[in-house]
């Protein structure tokens, strides 16, 4: 699929996987037909790079966050229906997400201003502002069947929050800037991708199961091949037992979770 004129920052598929939305540093979001690979429409309205995009559970609403600090709500006709104009973030909006367990749904946004905000999706009224990180918030993940929200930051910490009641739950130092966080509902783990590897936090026991899974470059002729690589992205297979990870050496590494609760 081609069409964007700059980096693609995030992609979200609709529930039936027939369509995809892509956010880009070119300031637009594109709606794609997955089967044909063609652009159906473009969401135009942000003044700078679009850093994140998310879809509502019925695929009828799209939320976007941008370097221009704006949060926008769109419909499937690519019309911007609302731009948040009160209690906005004071820096780039790095992550946007929907939370569907509560009715009406909530929107969650993270920013380079070091905060996370929770909004009522019906009127985009601010409900909570989470403070605690000391640098840009780079990643969020939500457990849909609970009230847990995890955040990761360039300050090298992860925090877990109660998204409904607006309370802080726990904080852990990962000793390295955090690129991605991902809950495992099967094992009550939080998997953390950092600039130096992968950590696995057992949430009930509040201790690291895997500290720390590091990888080095597969290119033996590189002068820095013995230095730890950065893990940049994480995704679970549908069965929750296989973890896919993207790394800074252009490789995808796959890990299987064994019965003794350790990554192999």
Q: Where do the protein language model's features map onto the residues?
A:
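WD40/WD-repeat beta-propeller blade N-cap
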Residues: 2-8, 44-50, 86-93, 131-137, ...
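Loop/turn segments within WD40 beta-propeller blades
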Residues: 12-17, 54-60, 97-104, 141-147, ...
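Short loop/turn segments that connect beta-strands within beta-propeller blades
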Residues: 34-37, 76-79, 121-124, 163-166, ...
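Conserved strand-to-loop turn within each blade of WD40 beta-propeller repeats
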Residues: 23-26, 65-68, 109-113, 152-155, ...
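WD40-repeat beta-propellers
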Residues: 29-32, 71-75, 96, 116-119, ...
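A structural motif specific to WD40 beta-propellers
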Residues: 38-41, 81-83, 125-128, 167-170, ...
């Amino acid at each position: 699929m081609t069409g964007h004129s700059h980096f693609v920052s995030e992609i979200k598929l609709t529930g039936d996987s027939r369509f995809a939305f892509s956010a880009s540093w070119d300031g637009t979001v594109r709606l794609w037909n997955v089967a044909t690979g063609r652009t159906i429409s473009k969401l135009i309205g942000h003044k700078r790079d679009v850093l994140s995009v998310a879809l509502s559970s019925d695929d009828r609403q799209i939320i976007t966050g941008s370097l221009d600090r704006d949060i926008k709500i769109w419909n499937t006709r690519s019309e911007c229906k609302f731009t948040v104009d009160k209690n906005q973030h004071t820096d780039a909006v790095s992550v946007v997400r929907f939370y569907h367990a509560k009715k009406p749904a909530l929107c969650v946004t993270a920013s380079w201003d070091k905060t996370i905000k929770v909004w009522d999706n019906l009127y985009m009224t601010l409900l909570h502002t989470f403070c605690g990180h000391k640098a840009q918030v780079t990643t969020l993940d939500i457990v849909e069947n609970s009230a847990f929200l995890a955040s990761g930051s360039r300050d090298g910490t992860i925090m877990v929050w109660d998204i409904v009641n607006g309370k802080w739950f726990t904080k852990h130092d990962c000793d390295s800037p955090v690129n991605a966080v991902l809950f495992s509902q099967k094992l009550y783990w939080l998997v953390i991708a950092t600039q130096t590897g992968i950590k696995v936090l057992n949430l009930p026991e509040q201790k690291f199961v895997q500290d720390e899974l590091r990888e080095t470059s597969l290119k033996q002729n590189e002068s820095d091949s013995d230095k730890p690589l950065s893990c940049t992205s994480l995704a679970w297979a549908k069965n929750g037992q296989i973890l896919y990870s993207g790394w800074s050496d252009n490789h995808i590494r796959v890990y299987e979770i064994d019965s003794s609760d350790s990554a192999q």
